[in-house]
């Protein structure tokens, strides 16, 4: 039976394709970097390339059997599918960052800019703080630099962008990596094929992931 997989475009795609190829899946057409978004060249595996926030949408509607997406999206959106495998790629961290003069212990109500309002809200609730969340798409780093927000919650891999913009990390919230998520119904209907894929990827994925 054919498995249909939603793969996150961009950095995740670039990092995961070598793993898929090493697991014996034909990825040449995707690696050719055309403008195609649907790939059905391998009779056993069909792929669609989508933006990260859309992976769970396709998965939840049963359009695809499997989604390959960052755990940041899983944590932010929430999901009702099976998170089956950490691929140990795309490692980065959720962080709280701001300018050097920011005081995280300050008692006044803080303004926090982020692409991840749910995760940010959860973090500050655990800290016992009531904050105002400003959702931003794009360069979140600008928010504390322009005075629009006191701090940001974002993901970082190396911290280079933060350093270049003179921002300091005040807390690490969680680690992030790329995960393989399976539709509940697909796991019942295509159990053998899905577990064969997972076993193949377990053999070729990085065993230890580091930042």
Swiss-Prot record:
It is an enzyme of class 2 (transferase). Pathway: Amino-acid biosynthesis; L-histidine biosynthesis; L-histidine from 5-phospho-alpha-D-ribose 1-diphosphate: step 1/9. The keyword Nucleotide-binding applies. GO terms for cellular component: cytoplasm. It is found in: Cytoplasm. Keywords: Amino-acid biosynthesis, ATP-binding, Cytoplasm, Glycosyltransferase, Histidine biosynthesis, Nucleotide-binding, Transferase. One of its GO terms (biological process) is L-histidine biosynthetic process. Its EC number is 2.4.2.17. InterPro entries: ATP_PRibTrfase_cat, ATP_PRibTrfase_CS, ATP_PRibTrfase_HisG, ATP_PRibTrfase_HisG_short. Disulfide bonds: none annotated. One of its GO terms (molecular function) is ATP binding. It catalyses: 1-(5-phospho-beta-D-ribosyl)-ATP + diphosphate = 5-phospho-alpha-D-ribose 1-diphosphate + ATP. Its main location: cytoplasm. NCBIfam families: hisG (TIGR00070). Heteromultimer composed of HisG and HisZ subunits. PANTHER family: ATP PHOSPHORIBOSYLTRANSFERASE, ATP PHOSPHORIBOSYLTRANSFERASE ATP-PRTASE. Catalyzes the condensation of ATP and 5-phosphoribose 1-diphosphate to form N'-(5'-phosphoribosyl)-ATP (PR-ATP). Has a crucial role in the pathway because the rate of histidine biosynthesis seems to be controlled primarily by regulation of HisG enzymatic activity. Lacks the C-terminal regulatory region which is replaced by HisZ. Belongs to the ATP phosphoribosyltransferase family. Short subfamily. This is ATP phosphoribosyltransferase. It comes from Lacticaseibacillus paracasei (strain ATCC 334 / BCRC 17002 / CCUG 31169 / CIP 107868 / KCTC 3260 / NRRL B-441).
């Amino acid at each position: 039976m054919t498995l249909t997989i939603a793969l996150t475009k961009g950095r995740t795609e670039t990092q995961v394709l070598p793993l898929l190829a090493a697991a014996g899946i034909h990825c040449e057409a995707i690696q050719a970097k055309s403008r195609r978004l649907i790939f059905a060249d391998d009779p056993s595996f069909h792929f669609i390339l989508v933006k990260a926030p859309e992976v769970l949408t396709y998965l939840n509607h049963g359009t695809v059997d499997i989604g390959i997406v960052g755990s940041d999206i899983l944590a932010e959106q929430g999901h009702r599918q099976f998170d089956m495998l950490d691929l140990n790629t795309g490692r980065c961290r959720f962080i709280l960052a701001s300018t050097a003069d920011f005081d995280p212990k300050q008692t006044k109500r803080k303004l926090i800019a982020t692409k991840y309002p749910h995760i940010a809200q959860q973090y500050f609730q655990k800290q016992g703080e009531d904050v105002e969340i400003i959702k931003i798409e794009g360069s979140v780093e600008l928010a504390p630099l322009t005075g629009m927000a006191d701090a940001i919650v974002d993901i970082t891999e190396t911290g280079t962008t933060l350093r270049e913009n003179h921002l300091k990390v005040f807390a690490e919230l969680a680690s992030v990596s790329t995960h393989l998520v399976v539709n509940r119904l697909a796991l019942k209907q295509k159990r053998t094929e899905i577990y064969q894929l997972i076993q193949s990827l377990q053999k070729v994925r990085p065993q230890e992931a580091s930042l």
